[in-house]
């Protein structure tokens, strides 16, 4: 018997508990108000609009039109028309014939594809103009005019449609990657009886090549209409003027007469688990999913405080499950490479159904053990719930996230608001603003006990409405269970006895014994960029640069000359995993998992790394957690911790993940590219499973000691919301006491992999499921190493296809 209303029951019980504790009268909850900083309205023709002034960044704005229309609305003979129509929106309109839109966008300094784009998904189509220079004359009105034409005035000429068929055909071909082909196998099994089974946005190539132009125009007229559209403008604009322009400009968009009803496409319930197994020759990972489907909270409740309660509980449940999976990952031979749990209010691609989801990256040949572990951990929660200590950590972590968002409320970029408003229009929910959300979340977190959280998650983990998905490489020698065997394993695991979750959490100080503080021996103010520079009694230099960009963040970097080039060829394989391994054991008296739990509720991080020519420490903290950052820095230099079991887990998982990397054609391309550029230099080769035969964890920890036990030569830089008088005691206590022998080193340039000289061409063929060609052109030359060239190079590479640094 399928429990169709379990989520509604669970949420209402939590809501009742919350309101009773808050001593409120139980009545129909009111929708949360719209953020007063958002100008929200609806025209008489049904068009919705959101306008918000935001000067982060100054003189720039984003212009979006969201269509509550996607590929899910296509009939069988229309598959692909939603995406095709998206392309046609850039091929001429009433006010921008032919390539007029592209020409205008480029005339004001924007670029098509980067600032001028769109996407089509199953349930929505969204068009965007981003980072528009609204300080230039006429840009606001012109961008609104483009949105106006997108709304209902596309040209859709026969010639443009015919020309675009070839473009779409090529996009269809190039996007037929392993993930797409896996989905095409999976969706019919996961969504039987639903349109979601066969409505991939790219569509059917047969439809693309053969539909009649009038069919596209009919689809456009049927679905592109103001009652299914929202205009979203966020940026450095005059809200009153923009609203007035919208009301005037969009008044000629006709309201639909007898419009087709935009219904949510349903996903049928199922008594027995549905099984989907998909393989592909170019897939490189084995991934296992278990979906526990459930009905969604109705939108009239989701836009009230009940929706906020639901979202809070979902975050709590996912956080605790991920923490449990992380504990398992640190076992010597974990049953999976990685695992996570989540509930994002969707059942994979379907918006009409929710799903509590657990997923894992499985090791080759160990699908049964992965599935068994996922089921047992789920049943552990089903039977016993979460512990009070787990809930407390998750609770303060969630509150910290909201606190950080609240503290940074005046520094949000345009795209953060745009995403929120697009989601509000297409999915419903609430947008009261972070001020109200933060206030309400604090009340919710204080008044919902762990028992109510447990009741919610236990209701979500049902006995029916279950879907199991498995994807992996189609490779000789890899055996997969049949659907029957996978179901048998699932049902067997569900009957296995489980015990309540047990944990030990240490509350001891991070640094149990503090040394006598050192001193600041020299202070220089008025330095470049307005910085203050301290020289400490152990020779370390500290640079402080207060800024007001973010109120809730201080960023720390520390570097010292040296780096990986100081190690010889015998350590090359160790260097390949050095940065991944040196901190898996934790710090001081805390394992990595215990340290993570100890830092619950804190916005802080600190990590060591080794580059070719330097040792590096990177960290960040909220001002309230600054002391913790200094404690982590101190421990990183003075109290590294080895954990053989954690390393064994890392080796097992990494080897399993690397095992089928070569099946991905782009990995083969990357390997060939590296060899073309650097020849056979072993320092430029990627990690392979066989490299672990030469990797030694004890040796890596010795290497860490060589590079990080002596802080000589390190320069620490702190940038952010810094109060210099407040940070001084931490500097004296934790940095001025770091061991320092006064030894200053430099990297070894001779060991840096050099690029091939002269002209060189490497062509190679690779069998692919869908043949395509990839080309990379690289140019090398000499450049003076100075600040101007470094910044120029960073600006250049920020627009490149990758993030390759300038060296």
Question: Where does each model-flagged region fall?
Answer:
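Single conserved hydrophobic/aromatic residue that forms the stacking wall/gate
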Residues: 796-807
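Non-catalytic, conformational "gating/processing" segments within enzyme and secreted inhibitor domains
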Residues: 153, 165, 179, 216-248, ...
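Catalytic Zn2+-binding segment of zinc metalloproteases
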Residues: 88-95, 585-586
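Histidine-centered catalytic micro-motifs
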Residues: 79-87
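A common structural junction motif
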Residues: 148-155, 250-256, 377-385, 636-642, ...
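Proteolytic maturation boundary segments
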Residues: 22-51, 238-326, 330-332, 392-396, ...
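Bacterial Sec-dependent N-terminal signal peptides
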Residues: 1-25
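M16 family metallopeptidases and their MPP-like homologs
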Residues: 50-52, 57-74, 81-82, 99-149, ...
């Amino acid at each position: 018997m399928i429990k169709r209303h379990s989520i509604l029951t669970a949420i209402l019980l939590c809501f009742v508990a919350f309101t009773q504790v808050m001593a409120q009268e139980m009545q129909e909850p009111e929708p949360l108000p719209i953020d007063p900083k958002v100008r929200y309205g609806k025209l008489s023709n049904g068009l919705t609009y959101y306008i918000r002034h935001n000067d982060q960044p100054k003189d720039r704005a984003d212009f979006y039109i969201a269509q509550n229309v996607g590929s899910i609305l296509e009939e069988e003979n229309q598959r692909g028309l939603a995406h095709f129509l998206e392309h046609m929106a850039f091929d001429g309109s009433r006010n921008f014939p032919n390539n007029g839109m592209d020409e205008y966008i480029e005339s004001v300094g924007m670029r098509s594809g980067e600032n001028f784009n769109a996407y089509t998904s199953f349930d929505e189509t969204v068009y965007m103009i981003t980072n528009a220079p609204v300080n230039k004359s006429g840009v606001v009105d012109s961008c609104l005019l483009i949105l106006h034409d997108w709304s209902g005035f596309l040209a859709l000429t026969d010639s443009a449609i015919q020309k675009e068929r070839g473009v779409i055909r090529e996009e269809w071909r190039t996007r037929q990657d392993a993930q797409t082909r896996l989905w095409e196998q999976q969706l019919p099994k996961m969504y039987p009886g639903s349109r979601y089974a066969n409505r991939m946005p790219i569509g059917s190539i047969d439809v693309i090549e053969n539909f009649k132009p009038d069919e596209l125009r009919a689809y456009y007229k049927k679905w592109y209409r103001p009652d299914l559209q929202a205009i979203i403008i966020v940026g450095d604009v005059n809200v009153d003027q923009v609203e007035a322009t919208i009301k005037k400009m969009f008044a000629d968009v006709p309201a639909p007469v007898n419009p087709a009803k935009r219904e949510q496409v349903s996903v049928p319930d199922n008594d027995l688990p549905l099984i989907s197994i998909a393989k592909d020759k170019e897939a490189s990972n084995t991934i296992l999913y278990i979906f526990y489907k459930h009905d969604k909270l109705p939108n009239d409740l989701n836009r009230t405080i009940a929706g906020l309660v639901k979202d809070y509980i979902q975050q709590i449940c996912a956080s605790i499950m991920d923490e449990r999976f992380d504990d398992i990952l640190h076992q010597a031979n974990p049953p999976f490479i990685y695992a996570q749990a989540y509930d994002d209010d969707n059942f994979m691609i379907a918006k009409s159904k929710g799903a509590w989801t657990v997923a894992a990256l499985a090791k080759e040949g160990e699908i049964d053990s992965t599935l068994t572990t996922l089921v047992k951990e789920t049943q552990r929660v089903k039977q016993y719930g979460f512990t009070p200590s787990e809930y407390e950590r998750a609770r303060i972590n969630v509150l910290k996230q909201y606190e950080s968002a609240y503290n940074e409320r005046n520094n949000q970029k345009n795209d953060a608001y745009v995403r929120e408003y697009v989601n509000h229009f297409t999915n419903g929910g609430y947008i009261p603003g972070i001020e109200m959300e933060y206030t309400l979340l604090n009340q919710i977190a204080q008044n919902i006990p762990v028992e109510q959280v447990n009741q919610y998650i236990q209701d979500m983990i049902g006995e029916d409405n279950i879907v199991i998905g498995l994807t992996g490489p189609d490779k000789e020698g890899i055996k997969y269970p049949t659907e029957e065997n996978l179901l048998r394993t699932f049902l067997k695991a569900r009957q296995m006895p489980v015990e309540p979750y047990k944990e030990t959490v240490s509350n001891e100080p991070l640094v149990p014994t503090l040394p006598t503080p050192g001193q600041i021996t020299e202070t220089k103010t008025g330095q470049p960029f307005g910085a203050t520079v301290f020289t400490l009694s152990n020779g370390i230099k500290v640079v402080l640069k207060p800024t007001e960009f973010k109120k809730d963040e201080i960023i720390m970097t520390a570097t010292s000359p040296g780096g990986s080039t100081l190690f010889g060829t015998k350590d090359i394989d160790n260097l390949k995993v050095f940065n991944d391994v040196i901190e898996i054991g934790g710090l001081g008296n805390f394992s990595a998992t215990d340290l993570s739990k100890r830092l619950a509720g804190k916005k802080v991080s600190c990590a060591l790394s080794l580059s070719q020519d330097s040792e590096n420490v990177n960290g960040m903290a909220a001002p309230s957690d600054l002391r913790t950052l200094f404690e982590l820095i101190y421990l990183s230099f003075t109290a590294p911790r080895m954990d053989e079991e954690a390393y064994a887990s890392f080796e097992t998982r990494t080897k399993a993940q690397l095992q089928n990397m070569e099946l991905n054609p782009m990995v083969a391309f990357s390997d060939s590219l590296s060899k073309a550029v650097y020849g056979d230099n072993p320092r430029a080769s990627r990690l392979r499973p066989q490299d672990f035969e030469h990797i030694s964890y004890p040796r890596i920890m010795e290497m860490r000691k060589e590079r990080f036990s002596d802080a000589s030569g390190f320069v620490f830089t702190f940038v952010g919301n810094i109060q210099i008088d407040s940070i001084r005691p931490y500097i004296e206590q934790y940095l001025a006491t770091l061991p320092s022998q006064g030894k200053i080193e430099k990297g070894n340039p001779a060991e840096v992999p050099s690029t091939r000289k002269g002209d060189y061409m490497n062509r190679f063929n690779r069998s692919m499921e869908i043949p395509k060609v990839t080309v990379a052109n690289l140019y090398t030359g000499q450049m003076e190493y100075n600040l101007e060239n470094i910044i120029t190079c960073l600006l250049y590479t920020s627009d490149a296809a990758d993030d390759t640094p300038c060296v």
